[in-house]
């Protein structure tokens, strides 16, 4: 099957992303993973599948990769739905990413799917580190839950710790500049998201995100403000 080859290529990319040296996985860290893997892995993967792509098309695809890298967290943003994000993180998470890769029909959708793959890889490796960080920063939670405090144990503490990791990385100037991110842009492949979500869970996206256009626009704006 043609799609199988690209899923295998994406699996190799997953291994690269899994070893990237970032501990916290807020918005900035997820985008930084795209930057780390862009020249060596993501761009070549796009060019292999779409050999005729122009430089401008590759640049636009970069913006879609940024969008895909935080799509699993869409439900946390205003007008979102936590159930959407909980599904993508805890129920058939890998299947969702696989469907994204299979359902991608053009270079922008494929870049968006690779961004979602990077998020999946980052969460597998990074969340245990964040859980340990929560226990260190919140002794009262450590006393209650032990040396690993998950998002389910205390969502607020988990999100604050993730963001704190981002702040530390910014302070140490480990991220590519805001000007570069603004130059590249930030795009969301709504059609691919809808197809992959329904293929994975058997329900339409708008059953969870009733204001999906507003949700996605708010998500795009909020992420651009964090950068």
Enumerate the predicted regions with their spans.
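Bacterial N-terminal signal peptides that target proteins for export
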Residues: 1-10
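Bacterial N-terminal signal peptides
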Residues: 9-18
């Amino acid at each position: 099957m043609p799609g199988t080859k690209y899923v295998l290529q994406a699996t190799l990319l997953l291994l690269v992303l899994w070893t990237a040296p970032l501990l916290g996985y807020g918005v900035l860290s997820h985008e930084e993973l795209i930057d780390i893997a862009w020249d060596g892995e993501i761009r070549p993967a796009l060019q292999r599948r779409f050999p005729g792509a122009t430089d401008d098309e590759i640049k636009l695809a970069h913006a879609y990769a940024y969008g895909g890298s935080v799509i699993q967290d869409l439900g946390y943003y205003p007008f979102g739905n936590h159930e959407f994000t909980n599904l993508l993180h805890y129920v058939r998470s890998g299947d969702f990413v696989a469907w994204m890769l299979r359902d991608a029909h053009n270079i922008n959708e494929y870049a968006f799917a690779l961004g979602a793959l990077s998020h999946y890889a980052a969460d597998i490796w990074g969340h245990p580190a964040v859980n340990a960080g929560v226990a260190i920063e919140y002794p009262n939670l450590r006393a209650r839950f032990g040396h690993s405090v998950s998002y389910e144990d205390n969502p607020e503490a988990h999100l604050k710790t993730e963001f704190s990791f981002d702040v530390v990385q910014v302070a140490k100037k480990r991220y590519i500049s805001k000007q570069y991110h603004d130059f590249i842009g930030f795009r969301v492949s709504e059609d691919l998201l809808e197809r992959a979500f329904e293929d994975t869970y058997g329900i339409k996206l708008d059953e969870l995100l009733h204001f999906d256009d507003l949700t996605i626009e708010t998500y795009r704006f909020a992420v651009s403000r964090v950068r």
